[in-house]
């Protein structure tokens, strides 16, 4: 078997088993609770009564809503399944399989075939990711669109293709509609990349267009806010100012975040064993120690 044939055979097996893990007995094990019922009713009204909407699911902050992208994304799956939530969940699971392929594609493009296959294998077979991918909820499609955004940023950095700044801005806007907390990752990352790689932007028009496209993804929420007497801004102001949500010091926040990231990252491979999680941390840190001169 030739090298490229073996590569694609391994990739096929990874994608096949990734799909199997995410779809097997989904009709029997799918969780359908209040949030899923609320979303299904809203999409039912869209499909049968043509009631369009400007906002999506509520966030973890009272009175603040996501954008409507998740509902419009689910609508075709509910239409094809005639209202069956299992079909909608299966559609999101296939997007998760698409994320496995994108990890392979990005890994191969950036670091080579072996890294691409290993990344796809770890993500596709991760217990945590498999469980997450079988969940009918708005954060579920986030990895797929995040990887698309990362691909656009990579094309901008490596191949000097300024148009991909516009595409990445649009995708980041969609990601924020799926999970507001992703802004903590996306906004600083994009700003740092734009400052760092500013000389690669062929024309200022791409930056302006990128900002306009990003704002365009926020227009439904902006219109909803002013249509309802500033309800979203009022809720955001209440969260930040009146309730004093950020009481911890900067060092306390950093410490808690690092512990959380460690727990989440290591838990994707070893959900329960503390000792094996330490092994993950050691393996992850080793390249930075061994190749610190090249890294920094």
Can you say where each PLM-predicted feature lies in the sequence?
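Transmembrane alpha-helices of multi-pass, membrane-embedded glycan-processing enzymes
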Residues: 66, 70, 74, 78, ...
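Extracytosolic helix-loop segments that constitute the early lumenal/periplasmic catalytic or substrate-binding loops
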Residues: 21-25, 37-65, 69-72, 76, ...
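Transmembrane-lumen/periplasm boundary regions of multi-pass, lipid-linked membrane glycan transferases
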Residues: 40-49, 174, 183-291
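Short acidic/glycine- and proline-prone juxtamembrane loop motifs at membrane-interface regions
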Residues: 128-141
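Membrane-interface transmembrane helices that cradle and orient dolichyl/undecaprenyl
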Residues: 1, 109-114, 149-167, 175
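Transmembrane-helix motifs of polytopic, lipid-linked glycan transferases
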Residues: 16, 90-110, 147-148, 152, ...
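Transmembrane signal-anchor helices characteristic of membrane glycosylation enzymes that use polyprenol
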Residues: 7-36, 210-227
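Short helix- or helix-capping micro-motifs
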Residues: 15-18, 119-124, 172, 176
């Amino acid at each position: 078997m030739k090298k490229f044939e073996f590569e694609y055979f391994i990739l096929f097996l990874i994608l096949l088993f990734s799909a199997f893990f995410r779809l097997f007995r989904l009709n029997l094990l799918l969780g359908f609770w209040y949030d899923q019922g609320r979303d299904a009713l809203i999409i039912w009204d869209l499909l049968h009564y043509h009631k369009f909407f400007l906002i999506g699911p509520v966030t973890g902050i009272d009175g603040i809503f996501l954008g409507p992208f998740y509902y419009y994304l689910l609508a075709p799956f509910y239409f094809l399944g005639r209202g069956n939530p299992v079909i909608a969940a299966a559609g999101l699971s296939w997007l998760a399989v698409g994320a496995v392929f994108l990890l392979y594609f990005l890994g191969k493009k950036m670091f080579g075939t072996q890294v691409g296959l290993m990344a796809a294998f770890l993500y596709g077979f991760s217990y945590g990711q498999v469980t997450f991918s079988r969940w009918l909820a708005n954060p579920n499609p986030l990895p797929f669109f995040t990887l698309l955004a990362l691909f656009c940023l990579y094309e901008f950095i490596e191949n000097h293709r300024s148009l991909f700044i516009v595409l990445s801005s649009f995708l980041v806007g969609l990601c924020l509609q799926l999970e507001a907390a992703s802004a903590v990752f996306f906004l600083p990352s994009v700003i740092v990349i734009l400052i760092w790689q500013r000389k690669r932007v062929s024309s200022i028009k791409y930056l302006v267009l990128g900002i306009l496209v990003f704002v365009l993804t926020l227009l439904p929420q902006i219109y909803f806010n002013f249509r309802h007497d500033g309800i979203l801004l009022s809720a955001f102001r209440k969260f930040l100012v009146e309730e004093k949500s950020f009481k911890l010091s900067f060092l306390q926040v950093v410490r808690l975040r690092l512990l959380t990231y460690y727990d989440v990252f290591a838990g994707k491979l070893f959900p329960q064993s503390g000792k094996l999680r330490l092994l993950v941390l050691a393996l992850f840190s080793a390249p930075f120690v061994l190749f610190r001169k090249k890294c920094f």
